[in-house]
Amino acid sequence: VYDYDTLKQRLREMAFLTKGLKIRLVDERSGMEQEEEFHYEGGIKEFVTYLNRSKEALYPDVIYCEGEKNGVYVEVAMQHNDSYSDSTYSFVNNITTPEGGTHLAGFRNALTKTFNEYAKSNKILKENETALSGDDIREGLTAIISVKISEPQFEGQTKQKLGNSEARGAVDSVVSEQLTYFLEQNPVVAKSICEKSLLAQRAREAARKARDLTRRKTALEGMSLPGKLADCSDKD
């Protein structure tokens, strides 16, 4: 039995991942007749906009990187929003990779490196200040990473993780180069992302200090307990 909604989701995903592709879904079952068409000229840029539809975007335009390195075709689209979660989805030859892999690792490395370099060179982050972590930069990020490889190698028990080493270098190279250019050309957007990342860093550090304080307090209370018991026994 075919589930219409499951097919609809997968076909919409395929249309997003292949810009310009037109897919029609027709249900001719009696009493359940319906028809939909999926066609996105903007490809994965429109995919990010679709995923961010119920959120408030931090900046209007989706950041887009595209290129080919060492036989690997790379496409990346991303946009920050007002949420606190990281919604990054990766694909290889239009197949989802829920466990990530080398393409995701390359993207994350490029993102962290590029934003830290920009923040330091533009005095948003002072030399003696702690570098932004990947988690800080990815807070509120929606991103699509799509690579095309002639011979993909999958790892893990469920084979849902990309293992090709060349994918990491390709994604890292394409994103580093094009994201650096984008940030230099769009300083207002760059500053807004860096400031959001700094807020995430401060919140994370404040939460860590609060946890440490609670743990120390609990430890001290635990240490004082035997003394109280000893006092009671002396009075008896």
Question: Which residues does each PLM region occupy?
Answer:
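GHKL-family ATPase ATP-binding module
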Residues: 1-236
